[in-house]
Design a protein with these regions (language model features):
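C-terminal recognition in membrane/secretory proteostasis and scaffolding
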Residues: 1-90
Length: 90
């Protein structure tokens, strides 16, 4: 099953999205520079407000596929392309 190697919670306020709580040090997200407190607002161009939104997008992909994450960090809009890994690799 594809995994990003992060733990998230639902964001608050006008930006919403998903707040990254933890990033597995062995994950592609970590290698690409995603950090705790980053806010994921979109994945592959689709708005992300809930964990279910992110899971729905991930279900269309396989291990080894790329996922474009749009992230807010300190008011700055960033984009990261991460490769989905098998959740058993963590």
């Amino acid at each position: 099953r594809p995994s990003l190697g992060i733990i998230v919670r639902r964001g608050q306020g006008e930006n919403g999205g998903l707040v990254v709580e933890e990033v597995d040090p062995d994950s592609a997200c970590h290698r690409q520079g995603i950090q705790p407190q980053d806010i994921i607002v979109a994945a592959n161009g689709q708005q992300v407000q809930t964990f279910a939104d992110l899971e729905r997008i991930k279900r269309t992909l396989d291990v080894g596929d790329s996922l474009l994450l749009e992230v807010l960090r300190g008011g700055e809009h960033l984009e990261f392309t991460v490769t989905l890994m098998d959740q058993d690799d963590f």
